[in-house]
């Protein structure tokens, strides 16, 4: 009986252990939220200069690559429908003439 009580107490202690959040401020691609593929970054296209379609946001808009994460897009820091996974160079700049994939939240 005592062993069962101890086992139940130990299992509940392990199950209720608090998980610490890792700092992903320097993570990119698949490391940042597990949403984008390796070599891609989450970007937020905040303006639309060539119509109301998605390509207008990516090709003609202002896409921010820094300080954008899936969590910020879900917290309405990035307007709905304007969060994309865009391929990036090793220096973190956005590649020209490549397709960005919309992230659906």
Swiss-Prot record:
Sorted UniProt keywords: Cell wall, Disulfide bond, Glycoprotein, Secreted, Signal
The UniProt record lists the keyword Disulfide bond: yes
Assembly with partners or alone: Self-assembles to form functional amyloid fibrils called rodlets. Self-assembly into fibrillar rodlets occurs spontaneously at hydrophobic:hydrophilic interfaces and the rodlets further associate laterally to form amphipathic monolayers.
Disruption phenotype: Leads to the repression of hcf-4 and induction of hcf-2 and hcf-3. Decreases the hydrophobicity of the cell surface. Leads to very few rodlets, which are found in dispersed patches. Does not affect the ability of the fungus to grow in vitro on agar plates or in liquid culture. Does neither affect mycelium growth and sporulation, nor the frequency and speed of conidium germination.
Disulfide cysteine pairs (residue numbers): 36-85, 44-78, 45-63, 86-100
Protein family (similarity comment): Belongs to the fungal hydrophobin family.
Tissue: Abundant on conidia and aerial structures formed in vitro and emerging from disease lesions on infected tomato plants.
Source lineage: Eukaryota, Fungi, Dikarya, Ascomycota, Pezizomycotina
Glycan-modified residues: 48, 67, 97
Protein's UniProt name: Class I hydrophobin 1
Induction: Expression is increased during sporulation. Expression up-regulated by carbon or nitrogen starvation.
Signal peptide (residue range): 1-17
Functional summary from the UniProt entry: Aerial growth, conidiation, and dispersal of filamentous fungi in the environment rely upon a capability of their secreting small amphipathic proteins called hydrophobins (HPBs) with low sequence identity. Class I can self-assemble into an outermost layer of rodlet bundles on aerial cell surfaces, conferring cellular hydrophobicity that supports fungal growth, development and dispersal; whereas Class II form highly ordered films at water-air interfaces through intermolecular interactions but contribute nothing to the rodlet structure.
Subcellular location: Secreted; Secreted, Cell wall
Subcellular location, principal: secreted
Domain of life: Eukaryota
């Amino acid at each position: 009986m005592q062993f069962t009580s101890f086992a139940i107490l130990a299992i509940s202690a392990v199950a209720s252990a608090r998980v610490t959040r890792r700092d992903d401020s320097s993570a990119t691609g698949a490391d940042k939220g597990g949403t984008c593929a390796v070599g891609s970054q989450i970007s937020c296209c905040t303006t639309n200069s060539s119509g109301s379609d998605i390509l207008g946001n990516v090709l003609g808009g202002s896409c921010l690559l820094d300080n954008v994460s899936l969590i910020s897009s879900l917290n309405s820091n990035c307007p709905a429908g304007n969060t994309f996974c865009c391929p990036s160079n090793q220096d973190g700049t956005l590649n020209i003439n490549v397709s960005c994939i919309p992230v659906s939240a």
